[in-house]
Amino acid sequence: ISDIKGVRYTEGRLLPYFFPDVFTEGGDPIGEARTNWMKARRAILRSPLDRIGYGGYLKLASNWPGFIDEIQNVVSKFRQIHENMQGTKSYVAPFKVAILNCWGGLRKWMSNQVHHSIYHRETYSAEGVLECLSGMPFDVEFIDFDDIRSGIPKDIGVIINVGDAYTAFSGAENWIDEKVVTAIRKFVDEGGGFIGVGEPTACQHQGRYFQLSDVMGVDREMGFSLSTDKYNTCDPHHFILEDIDTAIDFGEGTSRIYAQGKHYQILAQDGEYSQLVVNEYGKGHSVYFAGLPYSPQNCRILLRAIYYAAGMPEEMKHYYVTNVDTEVTVFPETKRIAVINNADAEEKTDLYIKGHLIDSLTLAPREMRWVDDAE
């Protein structure tokens, strides 16, 4: 919504709706309001809306003990964001991240595969990508395959392809177009990054299922190479997982993924098959995820994966917090920094600026702490 141009103001309607299915015995409208605000807050800090609102039957909300107080807190924090940013833009990395699918700029964030926050088992493992990106320090472009054919823009550092095979999300038959695969191979070979989630570049053709299996270092076993030896061993020691000390959630995942080539490293594995793989291709890098549902930990893994794929891991700590349940947004023009706690528990985190430890913070559950940028 905040990307819409040519309108007087933008407004987002937050959840929950004031409907009887939520405001009923056994319902938890306060819990839903908190959870949805924490997700929305990440995105609003990056690309703010002008207004927020709620919808439904007002009487239901007014009769629920404590709910109005919770909404007053949300509104107060929303105003606080605008007071501190003063209409300025937040800090972003020195490269853009591109989401590649069949819609490109036509649908943009609507390619999230979800409607009204309705859960679908078939899609939640892919939805995490855009949910995570919405609160990250990156300018995000949405490109289609004609954009690839016309020439990948120079300011794009990482291309992400997400979705099931033979869908508009992943690209279907576009992946057997020589112009497309050649352009992306050239992009990565010269130092660009490529991240795939689920069945990226998938289209069975000429003995390959993932048409960029050479770039990603993985392919999917479709029954044609069962007798081919696959020497896949896991080595989780990598920049991408340095903050991670608990099991990674791949959601439903993607079965029968195996690593192949000479320059891959398997970071996570389920039995004999791979779940998280990095690969070097020329001067560039790729990362493959079997699935990536939204969670604070997966946000951190994707953040690190993007900087790794872009070949700029040192840039990550330009502004950085150590605890995976916390995130940081910086407004250079107003010299204000927001550190947010995405957990329902107290969290401690260290704040880094330009690679140097600046402060150690203890944040209350769901807190948004504003500090001065002393840079």
Where are these regions (language model features)?
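Catalytic beta-strand/loop cores that center a nucleophilic Ser/Cys/Thr
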Residues: 224-282, 290-301, 306-359, 363-364
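A short helix->loop->beta-strand "cap" motif at the edges of active sites that frequently abuts
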Residues: 6-8, 190-193, 284
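Hydrophobic targeting/anchoring helices
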Residues: 1-122, 225-234, 242, 248, ...
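C-terminal beta-strand-rich structural cap/linker in extracellular carbohydrate-active enzymes
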Residues: 161-162, 359-375
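A glycine-rich, often tryptophan-bearing local segment used as a flexible ligand/cofactor-contacting loop or short
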Residues: 171-246
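A short, well-structured beta->alpha microelement
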Residues: 130-152
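Short, well-ordered secondary-structure micro-motifs within conserved domains or adaptor modules
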Residues: 151-173
